[in-house]
């Protein structure tokens, strides 16, 4: 093999490597994102044997969606803006398929990582979760523009486009929040919703006194107000032992 052909080989990895890269990245992505599901198997000692399978097999199976996606689009990706959109769109479509195949498994979507930014997620009410997920993936992968082989002007334009998108999401979300507050202020009959998340340990065989104490804590955490019609949502786990 001469030097020239060796350089070409290094720049063009085997397709199976794309599959492997996607599989490993997907496994780490889902392992870190849904490892919490094993907590439900610690409740009963009979289920503890399933923890290794839930911890390893579920992320591994889900990572196949990402592996096949990277396997298909990997050979066509380059250091340009078009490839960024192809990559982001393909991952978003992969998430969409994952939410539909075999009754659907729409967990750990990229968009969920922004649920703490109330202003940003408002747009999902208008364009839908999957479209918003596409925007989030594009923003997360946008730092790749620093490796583009384009001139500085095109890189600057791409960076400004990203900043503009972020500002637009924030401004729109802030507008929607304020608009909803005004609408709620003009509504006389309201029903409030309060989600309660106590830190009870799940136990069976509780005594009557323990059950009573648990109810008292739930009521205290709920902090009901007689002047407000409120729907309280308690997690099903709080009724363990009843």
Where are these regions (language model features)?
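Membrane-embedded alpha-helical bundles of multi-pass enzymes
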Residues: 1-182
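Soluble catalytic regions of membrane-associated enzymes that act on cell-envelope
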Residues: 173-242
């Amino acid at each position: 093999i001469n030097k020239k052909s060796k350089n070409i080989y290094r720049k063009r990895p085997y397709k199976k490597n794309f599959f492997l890269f996607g599989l490993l990245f997907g496994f780490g992505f889902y392992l870190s994102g849904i490892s919490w599901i094993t907590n439900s198997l610690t409740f009963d000692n009979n289920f503890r044997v399933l923890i290794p399978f839930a911890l390893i097999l579920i992320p591994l199976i889900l990572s196949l969606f990402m592996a096949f996606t990277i396997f298909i689009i990997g050979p066509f990706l380059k250091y340009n803006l078009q490839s960024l959109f192809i990559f982001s769109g393909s991952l978003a479509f992969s998430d969409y398929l994952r939410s539909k195949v075999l009754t659907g498994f729409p967990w750990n979507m990229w968009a969920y990582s922004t649920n703490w930014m109330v202003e940003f997620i408002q747009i999902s009410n208008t364009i839908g979760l999957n479209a918003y997920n596409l925007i989030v993936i594009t923003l997360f992968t946008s730092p790749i523009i620093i490796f583009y082989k384009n001139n500085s002007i095109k890189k600057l334009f791409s960076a400004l486009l990203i900043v503009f998108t972020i500002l637009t999401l924030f401004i729109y979300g802030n507008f929607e929040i304020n608009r909803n507050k005004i609408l709620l202020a003009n509504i006389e009959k309201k029903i409030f919703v309060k989600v309660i998340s106590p830190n009870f340990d799940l136990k069976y065989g509780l005594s009557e006194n323990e059950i009573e104490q648990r109810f008292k804590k739930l009521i205290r955490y709920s902090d009901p107000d007689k002047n407000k019609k409120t729907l309280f949502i308690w997690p099903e786990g709080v009724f363990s032992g009843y």
